[in-house]
Amino acid sequence: MNSAQSPGSLSRLHSHFLDYLRRKKQRRAGRKWGRDQGNKRLRYSYDLGPRSLVFDCGAYLGDFASEVVERYQCQVFCFEPLQTYFAQLSRRFAGEAKITCLNYGIGSSSREAKISVEKDASSLFRATESAKLETVRFVDINEALQLAGGRKIDLLKLNIEGGEFEVLDAILDRNLATRFRHIQVQFHQIIPDFHERRLRIRAGLAKSHQIGYDYYFIFESWSLRPA
């Protein structure tokens, strides 16, 4: 066997081919999301009302929170760890009683960590050479749930550039999934074992929730099964 056909080379070729297939599948899902008008028809379509409670993780500039409050008059907690975007959120929603802005993210532990500042692509897990790094605060998911005062979270929205794996793993490991009626998540391909971890998380969620819509690494939504 020559070097081009060595086990290591074949393994790398196989890995590259799988990456190609996954990127192709994601592009296909993205086109379908666009055709289906997902940002208009799906992202905000939940059975919510004035008594509903929403956790918006990765609130960024507040567009998601603004839309769900306009539609449903529900209560929203916006989690945004980056100071620049938190400041903009706070100004935008000053005087809005339905929206609470919190200057921290949610994780599996309470800690400080460095995150890249790259608009809506800010992440713990990637940074361009020109990206600024900011030390931000995270709180444990159990601590964050205390904000609900024992109530269920009607919608957990996760768009946190790789942090979704940590949050959902913690929710499943601690048997907290039934605290959330709906979970909307955008998974990101920016950690080494993203494919396997997504599959494990989906298998865990399927024990208590059913899939609503599923656009591969674009957006997916899960709803708590009827009792």
Tell where the protein language model's regions lie, with residue ranges.
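Phosphate/nucleotide-binding beta-alpha loop and adjacent structural elements of enzyme active sites
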Residues: 1-227
